[in-house]
Amino acid sequence: MAENSESLGTVPEHERILQEIESTDTACVGPTLRSVYDDQPNAHKKFMEKLDACIRNHDKEIEKMCNFHHQGFVDAITELLKVRTDAEKLKVQVTDTNRRFQDAGKEVIVHTEDIIRCRIQQRNITTVVEKLQLCLPVLEMYSKLKEQMSAKRYYSALKTMEQLENVYFPWVSQYRFCQLMIENLPKLREDIKEISMSDLKDFLESIRKHSDKIGETAMKQAQHQKTFSVSLQKQNKMKFGKNMYINRDRIPEERNETVLKHSLEEEDENEEEILTVQDLVDFSPVYRCLHIYSVLGDEETFENYYRKQRKKQARLVLQPQSNMHETVDGYRRYFTQIVGFFVVEDHILHVTQGLVTRAYTDELWNMALSKIIAVLRAHSSYCTDPDLVLELKNLTVIFADTLQGYGFPVNRLFDLLFEIRDQYNETLLKKWAGVFRDIFEEDNYSPIPVVNEEEYKIVISKFPFQDPDLEKQSFPKKFPMSQSVPHIYIQVKEFIYASLKFSESLHRSSTEIDDMLRKSTNLLLTRTLSSCLLNLIRKPHIGLTELVQIIINTTHLEQACKYLEDFITNITNISQETVHTTRLYGLSTFKDARHAAEGEIYTKLNQKIDEFVQLADYDWTMSEPDGRASGYLMDLINFLRSIFQVFTHLPGKVAQTACMSACQHLSTSLMQMLLDSELKQISMGAVQQFNLDVIQCELFASSEPVPGFQGDTLQLAFIDLRQLLDLFMVWDWSTYLADYGQPASKYLRVNPNTALTLLEKMKDTSKKNNIFAQFRKNDRDKQKLIETVVKQLRSLVNGMSQHM
Amino acid sequence: MAKTYDYLFKLLLIGDSGVGKTCLLFRFSEDAFNTTFISTIGIDFKIRTIELDGKKIKLQIWDTAGQERFRTITTAYYRGAMGIMLVYDITNEKSFDNIKNWIRNIEEHASSDVERMILGNKCDMNDKRQVSKERGEKLAIDYGIKFLETSAKSSANVEEAFFTLARDIMTKLNRKMNDSNSAGAGGPVKITENRSKKTSFFRCSLL
């Protein structure tokens, strides 16, 4: 090569290019060839020449090689020609062998095809088996799911669904049936939800229907526990706690109908059996439903629904019947429903996790408590029967104690009970007003007669009357008071008992109860009994007999008040040394009543006097008196004498005051007769007749119709009349006018105005007589004198006016 | 003071304790009834004005205690009575038997010309009756006086009883006045005398 190169005498550049062409790949020839053209303008011609030279060199070398190997080639061809013959022989042999093989192998081929078919089948079978082994568990689980759904084992069904979704479906998700299953699961879940919710609704309806029984049982337990000892209470609490324990892992798979587990008959037979709410109601629907919703991740929906429904039920339970206040059973049903409701809530609070919370139950209870208090306040105000109010108090206390035992605060209920207690006492006061009225209505207002020791002791046992003198008297004898006194005393004690009943179980101290009782008793005495007494005394048709006896009765009732104080002290078991902040004010009641009765006696007597005075039939122009006192006045005097004669049991001071009042009233009435503006003329004869009547009054006054008057005290009632009449009958004007204003005047009590009025009535008489007496000197002189005295009296009257 | 009535008649109620004297008076004067028995002590009275033949009559009716211990006091009022009602209780035979004693008391203490009347009270309690109406009537006939069964409770015959007695008193009074008139005859002086006599008679009657 080197030699060829030297002989051609090529350009070094073209040498390099040819080297590259020979060494590089075909793909990279382009750039190399382009470099040829990029070079000198005629470069490619020279390049072609060099290229042809390279070609001829290579051909020469090839020729040399062929010459060198020529002999070997010929030998080889000769051998090949020999082989040809051998080959032709071999070909015949192989064809024949092949033909024989073909004939012999035909059966083998047939068998082989069978084998191939079998192997394909086996492979297919294997594949199918593998696939099926993946699918079968899914189908089994789905079948199980269906079975669980049919058996209502929803929780297990949910578990199965979860396994299907998480474990089995990924293996077979490409299959159609699997898609169908996957699409069906949400529907099944919704079905489970709906069924569980339906169960829950049934449960809610059930506990609503059975709230009464639940509440009744709980309240009975609360009542029973009050009679147990402390240790027994502890024992019950432990038992109760044990019953409240729930093992969530053992939630029953079977769903029982939500019914009371104990029939009413069983209840009656086992009245003393202590039952828990779980013994009465099947709570499993709540537990199952809660778990199902938890598993489904929809716990909040369940909680919201449950709470919402229970709030609705609470409002229903808290809505009383419109006529609840009419019977104690109405209240009882109301209370038992409420207790039943909250006992269930408390149970669920303790056995579930978060379904209800303490905050939720407290909120619910506060709402309920406000409603309950409003309801009780409204309905109790309709009660007019104290026994019903008392029953309401007892029920309320049991109600409060029951719920307090479950942890609900009930202080506001006890506050309400104090309001109801005031109303209870008001109701009692009304009832006792009726009682007192009946007692007064039935009294015969005469001293109680007793004919033997037995009867005497009966009265003494009812009323604490102590009188050694009466005790020594022989039978038959009489107590000074009438039948109403022991009856009232007994009824006041009954009132105290009734008032005390309300305070039982209200958790108040004896001192507080004692004070409350005294306040109530004070109201009874100072308001109720006082009103009844005053109404009795002011009855239009009450007679002197009744009034006199009332005075005696109130005296003895007043003395008995200290025994009532002792009675209250004993009944509340407080120490005798305890200072009472409240004392009985009954004393003032009886004093006031006595004063009213006394006043009424004076009024009645004066009315009788007025009736007599209206019968007066004076002939005011008579010329000569009858010579005897007027008939009406004698009847009047005799009547008064009889009155004071028969009412010997009237207290001395009252009798004296009554007598004085009567005399003063009579005197005033007689004076009014003389001064009556409708009476125009009075004759001296009439004055003299009138004087006879006044003399009778004075005789009555001086006869001491009532013992105890000193000197002429009673006669002073008629002194004005006496001096006036003396002045006119004696015609002592010179003395009167001369001594007027002097303390020692005989006619000190004669009012000039009065004298003037009466004198003018007599002057009129004289004027009439004047016609006929023109010629009688004495009459003329008398007329002049009257005129003179009239003028002088008039000046006195005017003088008095100036001074005034 | 001007009189507000024409005549004053004084009546008296007597009889055993508890027969209903006060209740009869209460019914007549107040038209009311009180079921509770309250024993009258001593003497009491009520006034009611009625009209008879155009005249205003004031009836002053004295109610007496039936108990023995008040006999002295109540007897003092017999003399002034112009009419007396003897009351018994038809349910209490003893009170009926005692009417004879009460009549004897009247003859002893009352004016000889007093008008009388027997009343059988409580006739509403027929189921407890012990004295038949016939026996009451016979007793009254025997003494030549009027008889009525009454009931203060039901107000049966109460008005009738008092009006009957008042009318009888009025009749008797009118008869006396007529007798007095017929006795007089002649001139003005006699007329004056008659007036004086009438006035005097009237006043005596009141007394």
UniProtKB/Swiss-Prot annotation, chain A:
<dbReference type="GO" id="GO:0000145">
    <property type="term" value="C:exocyst"/>
</dbReference>
<dbReference type="GO" id="GO:0005829">
    <property type="term" value="C:cytosol"/>
</dbReference>
<dbReference type="GO" id="GO:0006904">
    <property type="term" value="P:vesicle docking involved in exocytosis"/>
</dbReference>
<comment type="function">
    <text>Component of the exocyst complex involved in the docking of exocytic vesicles with fusion sites on the plasma membrane. Together with RAB11A, RAB3IP, RAB8A, PARD3, PRKCI, ANXA2, CDC42 and DNMBP promotes transcytosis of PODXL to the apical membrane initiation sites (AMIS), apical surface formation and lumenogenesis.</text>
</comment>
<dbReference type="InterPro" id="IPR042045">
    <property type="entry name" value="EXOC6/Sec15_C_dom1"/>
</dbReference>
<dbReference type="GO" id="GO:0005886">
    <property type="term" value="C:plasma membrane"/>
</dbReference>
<dbReference type="InterPro" id="IPR048359">
    <property type="entry name" value="EXOC6_Sec15_N"/>
</dbReference>
<keyword id="KW-0653">Protein transport</keyword>
<dbReference type="GO" id="GO:0048471">
    <property type="term" value="C:perinuclear region of cytoplasm"/>
</dbReference>
<dbReference type="Pfam" id="PF20651">
    <property type="entry name" value="EXOC6_Sec15_N"/>
</dbReference>
<comment type="subunit">
    <text>The exocyst complex is composed of EXOC1, EXOC2, EXOC3, EXOC4, EXOC5, EXOC6, EXOC7 and EXOC8. Interacts with CNTRL. Interacts with RAB11A in a GTP-dependent manner.</text>
</comment>
<dbReference type="GO" id="GO:0090543">
    <property type="term" value="C:Flemming body"/>
</dbReference>
<protein>
    <recommendedName>
        <fullName>Exocyst complex component 6</fullName>
    </recommendedName>
</protein>
<dbReference type="InterPro" id="IPR046361">
    <property type="entry name" value="EXOC6/Sec15_C"/>
</dbReference>
<keyword id="KW-0268">Exocytosis</keyword>
<dbReference type="InterPro" id="IPR007225">
    <property type="entry name" value="EXOC6/Sec15"/>
</dbReference>
<dbReference type="GO" id="GO:0006887">
    <property type="term" value="P:exocytosis"/>
</dbReference>
<dbReference type="GO" id="GO:0090148">
    <property type="term" value="P:membrane fission"/>
</dbReference>
<dbReference type="GO" id="GO:0000281">
    <property type="term" value="P:mitotic cytokinesis"/>
</dbReference>
<comment type="similarity">
    <text>Belongs to the SEC15 family.</text>
</comment>
<dbReference type="GO" id="GO:0090522">
    <property type="term" value="P:vesicle tethering involved in exocytosis"/>
</dbReference>
<keyword id="KW-0813">Transport</keyword>
UniProtKB/Swiss-Prot annotation, chain B:
<dbReference type="InterPro" id="IPR027417">
    <property type="entry name" value="P-loop_NTPase"/>
</dbReference>
<feature type="binding site">
    <location>
        <position position="35"/>
    </location>
    <ligand>
        <name>GTP</name>
    </ligand>
</feature>
<keyword id="KW-1003">Cell membrane</keyword>
<dbReference type="GO" id="GO:0031346">
    <property type="term" value="P:positive regulation of cell projection organization"/>
</dbReference>
<dbReference type="GO" id="GO:0051286">
    <property type="term" value="C:cell tip"/>
</dbReference>
<keyword id="KW-0967">Endosome</keyword>
<protein>
    <recommendedName>
        <fullName>Ras-related protein Rab-8B</fullName>
        <ecNumber>3.6.5.2</ecNumber>
    </recommendedName>
</protein>
<keyword id="KW-0636">Prenylation</keyword>
<feature type="binding site">
    <location>
        <position position="63"/>
    </location>
    <ligand>
        <name>Mg(2+)</name>
    </ligand>
</feature>
<dbReference type="GO" id="GO:0030670">
    <property type="term" value="C:phagocytic vesicle membrane"/>
</dbReference>
<feature type="binding site">
    <location>
        <position position="23"/>
    </location>
    <ligand>
        <name>GTP</name>
    </ligand>
</feature>
<dbReference type="GO" id="GO:0045335">
    <property type="term" value="C:phagocytic vesicle"/>
</dbReference>
<feature type="binding site">
    <location>
        <position position="21"/>
    </location>
    <ligand>
        <name>GTP</name>
    </ligand>
</feature>
<dbReference type="GO" id="GO:0045046">
    <property type="term" value="P:protein import into peroxisome membrane"/>
</dbReference>
<dbReference type="GO" id="GO:0005778">
    <property type="term" value="C:peroxisomal membrane"/>
</dbReference>
<dbReference type="GO" id="GO:0019882">
    <property type="term" value="P:antigen processing and presentation"/>
</dbReference>
<feature type="short sequence motif" description="Switch 1">
    <location>
        <begin position="31"/>
        <end position="45"/>
    </location>
</feature>
<dbReference type="GO" id="GO:0150115">
    <property type="term" value="P:cell-substrate junction organization"/>
</dbReference>
<feature type="modified residue" description="Cysteine methyl ester">
    <location>
        <position position="204"/>
    </location>
</feature>
<keyword id="KW-0460">Magnesium</keyword>
<feature type="binding site">
    <location>
        <position position="66"/>
    </location>
    <ligand>
        <name>GTP</name>
    </ligand>
</feature>
<keyword id="KW-0449">Lipoprotein</keyword>
